[in-house]
From Swiss-Prot:
Glycans are attached at residues 212, 308, 360, 819, 824, 827, 893. This is Probable dipeptidyl-aminopeptidase B. GO terms for cellular component: plasma membrane; vacuolar membrane. The chain crosses the membrane at residues 100-120. GO terms for biological process: proteolysis. Residues 121-899 are vacuolar. It is found in: Vacuole membrane. The gene is DAPB. It comes from Trichophyton verrucosum (strain HKI 0517). Pfam families: DPPIV_N, Peptidase_S9. It is a single-pass type II membrane protein. Keywords: Aminopeptidase, Glycoprotein, Hydrolase, Membrane, Protease, Serine protease, Signal-anchor, Transmembrane, Transmembrane helix, Vacuole.
Length: 899
């Protein structure tokens, strides 16, 4: 869900079928990231669905210990609004719009609460001293002061949440040349100057040099088929760059999936034809290039087809797909929780086989979502039924309910036949999740599966040529450290190359090693014991980010300097020469994306100071190329004009664990005053909110404009502090996390500059659950106020894949589910006041969660809460711009002041 990475040797981003473009500048000067009207050049988000070389994974965090699997971090219950504010790093246009509305909603919802809270904290009897004083009662740890004068202007709320402070970012779509050339990217011209779609050498990104590697793919932004004018919305060039797969008329489905009309555009003739000439208006769910560029596999109406480019014929690979059977694409829960994308079709590297997932959700129960004010486009109720709500039925497996059953199928291109491969000792169908499929060379395929409670993990090697397979790795994570494994998307296939010192095929994986997540190299494929590439009391994060196969160098991002920092490192495939990228600072947060052959990289400095981006050659590349792509001069200018809070990084010790903390202090902070404190949290398993990223958001506004102290604590269960720190929450979500927030609040309440009678906490989604769990456990002793948005209140109501990973099935952990639910209404009644908000059409955290809690409150006659329901709003609560009403209402005036 987070940042995307292009796979090594691939032309696609596997998380989603690629949106067409992300705004880019032609010059070094910064651009306004909220305006693209004057931009004439953009870089295409994705290039092809064909995987023609060993893959590089998406950004995540997996691990194992000496051959034992670990996990990657996923915020399944959030939309990454806190971290990315308004500008997502992946450049996806449709997702960006969703995140914009989502973040605006979050901030404005809480804005109404915080502004009203201001009336409370500044009311008679709550005044504090304003005399200036330079004291020494400050927390220990790093202090980030961006050089902003305390007398600067205050940040308007609309600016803090509206993208004005979002760093300008550039997303590069790296692409391999037709002959494997490195350092190429896909570009799209917006302003009518130059060709519409072309491949360019990264060293000529501004178009100032002539270069033989430049290839024009589409001269114009439109093409015609039978006199129909067609404007492509997404494009994927073939690996040989002779044909472009174009999509139009996109319709969103779930978070990552969509449908559209697909076309084949011939680069030489600049003409196009339907992907399926016999069904040009058929809505296609997914289309992927063959690595040999001579065929496209696609799914339509849940059936898998193949189109051979040498003819206009389309062959059906499956025919029984329908409401409950999916071929080549995931169902809802696999898209959301397992693959984090819409792809379940994989070509072999030689183009001879297609691997595809068969998903059967016949036994999965349906959950109804009622829409009282809206309905899908084209829906017309029967006469006389206009007053009834539209009901959408979703196949949604809740904890303990039947999951979809899956199996991996194969299609032999030459023989035109489908087949399956029986592998001995695999998990039973009703207890199996297929979480990763990695095509290799010579018909080999790596398949990773887990049990539904995500603690038994098996890796199989299947030989499609011989139609046989075997389990080569098997581990029980529960026996290793009591933890879990999450779906992996980072495994990287390493082909044999005796001339480069690699006699056998292998793969790079992330493993748990001595309690931390590290890189390991398995070779040959059947070897269960890896060569450890990294070790130590720190963790790899994006692993690997790139692989230079010519020089046997692996690049990755890690927390070696500090859990809240990110730096780029390299290591040899033999485990030697571990080095930090020389451009890195000691205290910083970096991200990176690599070219096809890892000879070039887009290095992104993301904080704590003003972010910048550079295109540079990799250390293993003698080119010594460097290009400053973004300096964010506009953002630097803003930072000199406005008064921002100072950020104080520290740790606090709770039960022997060191918890990362960031405290945002108002400008002109005076230690003789007594400040109200707002705790903001997310806290989901493996997540991280305290880091060194530059971020101006709603929390900044609260500290800067309202004069509060805003504290964020990453308690136990969060990521990047080792397995012991994280896995302690297993089977008992909410207990340790809430305890840590309370202990942190008590520690802050003892500080001389904190008014411990005015402490509040708030969060969204998992953060909403954590807010209520903290208020429940605290029973009014430390926190007086809270706000929970779209909270989980009973883990039996959330989806099975996510929930059982941390809680096991309810049948196997009844007491844990009871403890993790929000059920102690008596304790909640001890708080001064709390607010619950939820959208009635939330398809992620169902409204059922809030209704169940309300019933408990009603039974015990609890009155110290308020409730706001947003009709027809989903998890983002933006139907009819509902956030505006939240922002305008005087809720906390009435709650705190009584008028």
């Amino acid at each position: 869900m987070k940042l995307d990475r292009m796979r090594v040797g691939s032309r696609i981003n596997d998380e989603e079928a690629m949106p067409l473009t992300a705004p880019e500048s032609r010059a070094r000067d910064s651009i306004d990231s909220s305006s693209t009207a004057s931009i004439s050049l953009t870089l295409v988000e994705g290039a092809s669905h064909a995987t023609t070389e060993p893959s590089k994974p998406a950004h995540n965090h997996n691990g194992r210990t000496q051959g034992n699997y670990a996990e990657k971090y996923r915020d399944d219950l959030e939309e990454d609004w806190e971290e990315n504010n308004y500008i997502p790093t992946n450049g996806k246009s449709s997702q960006r719009r969703t995140l914009i509305v989502f973040w605006l909603l979050v901030a404005l919802c809480v804005g109404g609460w915080a502004v009203a809270f201001l009336f409370f904290v500044t009311s008679p009897g709550n005044k504090t001293s304003t005399s200036p004083h330079s004291g020494s009662n400050s927390p220990e740890g790093d202090v980030t002061k961006p050089g902003i004068p305390a007398t600067g202007k205050k940040i308007p709320l609309d600016d803090a949440i509206g993208g004005v402070w979002s760093p300008a970012e550039h997303t590069i779509s790296w692409i391999a040349g037709a002959k494997g050339e490195d350092g190429l990217l896909l570009q799209k011209s917006e302003g009518g100057t130059g060709p519409y779609l072309h491949v360019e050498d990264v060293r000529n990104i501004h178009g100032t040099q002539s270069n033989n590697n430049s290839i024009v793919l589409m001269k114009e932004s439109v093409f015609f088929v039978n006199d129909e004018r067609i404007s492509p919305e997404k494009v994927w060039p073939s690996p040989d760059l002779k044909t472009v797969l174009a999509m139009t008329r996109e319709k969103k489905n779930w978070r990552h999936s969509f449908t559209g009309l697909y076309w084949l555009f011939d680069v030489e003739t600049q003409t196009a034809q339907p992907l399926d000439p016999d069904a040009p208006n058929g809505r296609i769910q997914l289309a992927t290039w063959s690595p040999t560029s001579d065929a496209v596999a696609f799914t339509r109406d849940n059936n898998l087809y193949i189109r051979n480019l040498t003819s206009k014929s389309v062959k059906a690979i499956t025919t029984d797909g329908g409401t409950n059977l999916f071929y080549g694409i995931p169902d809802w829960v696999y898209e959301e929780e397992v693959f984090e994308g819409n792809i379940a079709t994989w070509w072999s590297l030689d183009g001879k086989y297609i691997s595809y997932l068969r998903t059967n959700e016949t036994l999965v129960p349906e959950f109804p979502i009622d829409f009282y004010l809206s309905s899908p486009p084209g829906y017309s109720p029967k006469p006389g039924e206009e007053s009834y709500p539209y009901v959408q039925q979703i196949k949604y497996p809740k904890a303990g309910a039947p999951n979809p059953t899956v199996s991996l199928q194969f299609y032999d291109i030459e023989r035109e036949e489908s087949f399956s491969v029986d592998v001995k000792d695999t998990l039973k169908d009703d207890d199996r999740l297929i979480v990763e499929v990695i095509p290799g060379s010579k018909g080999k395929v790596l398949v990773r599966e887990t049990n539904r409670e995500s603690y038994i993990v098996k890796v199989a090697v299947i030989d499609a040529n011989k139609r046989e397979g075997k389990i080569v790795r098997s581990d029980n994570i529960d026996e290793i450290d009591g933890g879990w494994v999450e779906p992996s998307h980072t495994t990287t296939y390493i082909p044999a190359d005796p001339s480069a010192g690699r006699p056998d095929d292998g793969y790079i994986d992330t493993v748990i090693h001595e309690g931390y997540i590290h890189l390991a190299y398995f070779t040959p494929l059947e070897n269960p014991k890896p060569k450890m590439l990294t070790t130590g009391k720190w963790e790899v994060v994006a692993a690997p980010s790139g692989v230079d196969l010519k020089n046997n160098v692996v690049y990755f991002v890690a927390t070696k300097e500090s859990p809240i920092d990110r730096h780029v490192y390299s290591v040899k495939l033999d485990g030697s020469e571990l080095r930090m990228l020389k451009d890195s600072d000691k205290s910083a947060y970096y991200d990176v994306s690599f070219s096809h052959g890892a000879g070039y990289m887009l290095l992104k400095y993301q904080g704590p100071q003003i972010p910048w981006q550079k295109l540079i050659s990799s250390p293993s590349n003698a080119d010594n190329y460097i290009e400053i792509l973004e300096e964010n001069k506009k953002l630097a200018k803003l930072s000199n004009e406005f008064a921002l809070p100072s950020l104080h990084y520290s740790t606090i010790t709770v039960d022997g664990f060191e918890l990362p903390v960031v405290e945002r202090r108002p400008p002109n902070f005076d230690e003789t005053k007594k400040y109200p404190v707002l705790f903001q949290l997310y806290g989901g398993p493996g997540s991280q909110t305290v880091n060194k990223k530059f971020l101006v958001n709603f929390q900044t506004y609260v500290a800067s404009n309202l004069g509060y102290i805003v504290v964020t604590v990453d308690g136990r269960g969060t990521g990047f502090n080792g397995r012991k720190f994280k896995c302690i929450v297993r089977r008992n979500l909410g207990h340790y996390e809430a305890h840590d927030q309370i202990q942190a609040a008590k520690a802050w309440g003892k500080k001389p500059y904190v008014d411990k009678t005015r402490m509040a906490i708030w969060g969204w989604s998992y953060g909403g659950f954590m807010t209520l769990k903290t208020l429940e456990q605290d029973a009014g002793e430390t926190f007086q106020y809270g706000m929970a948005v779209a909270p989980v209140t009973n883990w039996r109501y959330y989806d099975s894949v996510y929930t059982e990973r941390y809680m096991h099935m309810p049948q196997n952990n009844e007491g844990g589910y009871e403890n993790a639910s929000i059920s102690n209404a008596t304790n909640l009644s001890q708080n001064t006041r709390f607010l619950i908000m939820h959208g009635s059409a939330d398809d992620n955290v169902h409204f059922q969660n809030t209704l169940t809690l309300l019933d408990k409150l009603d039974i015990l006659g609890v009155h110290n809460y308020d409730m706001h329901v947003f009709p027809d709003s989903n998890h983002g609560i933006y139907f009819h711009h509902a956030y505006k009403m939240v922002h305008q209402r005087k809720y906390f005036n009435l709650s705190f002041l009584g008028h």
